[in-house]
Each structure stands twice: as C-alpha cells, then as structure tokens.
C-alpha cells in the first residue's frame, strides 16, 4: 500500500512540475488543459494525436519552431527559449492528458 501511495504522489508531483514548466515557458498564455483559449486544449491535442507513433517528435518540433494550419488560423509562435529536453517533457505531459 505504501508503494502505491508513493507512486501516486510521485506521479502527481511530476504532473505539477510539468504544469509549472508550461507556465514558466508561457505555454499557458495560449493553452489550458481542459479548454480552448487561443490555442487548443491539451486534452484535445492528446486526443488528436493518440496512437500516432510520430506524435511526440512532431509536437516537440512544433513547440520549438512553431507552426500553423492544424488548429485554425492562429499560428503557434516559435519558442526558442524552450530546450529540446524541456519540449520533450512538456509534450509527454500534454499527450498524457485525458
């Protein structure tokens, strides 16, 4: 039972760390977990890319380089302040949203 509690606590702490990283990199200025703002909700991104083998690599590139045309007319700006490791971590967190 203690191991399960520790695993749940660790997962929650990791999720909070990823949310904090998303805030610190200004992702949350345009995105939210459960609702569309300027950009799509993270839950919608996770649903759209579910089961796609190249989703992580595609989204990491989009986080860093920006992109347009996937979710409507508003382009996602490039984010050169986000490292590749940070982008991978953020994308994994986004893709885990349900």
Language model features: what each stretch is:
Residues 2-11:
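Bacterial N-terminal signal peptides
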Residues 16-33:
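Sequence/structural segment immediately N-terminal to covalent heme-attachment motifs in c-type
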Residues 29, 37-49, 62-91:
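Axial heme c-ligation environment in periplasmic c-type cytochrome domains
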């Amino acid at each position: 039972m203690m191991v399960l509690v520790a695993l749940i606590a660790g997962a929650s702490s990791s999720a909070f760390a990823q949310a904090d990283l998303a805030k610190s990199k200004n992702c949350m200025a345009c995105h939210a977990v459960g609702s569309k703002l300027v950009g799509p909700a993270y839950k919608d991104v996770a649903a759209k890319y579910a089961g796609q083998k190249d989703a992580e690599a595609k989204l990491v590139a989009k986080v860093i380089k920006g992109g347009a045309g996937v979710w409507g007319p508003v382009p996602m700006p490039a984010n050169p302040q986000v490292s590749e490791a940070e982008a991978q971590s953020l994308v994994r967190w986004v893709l885990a949203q349900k």
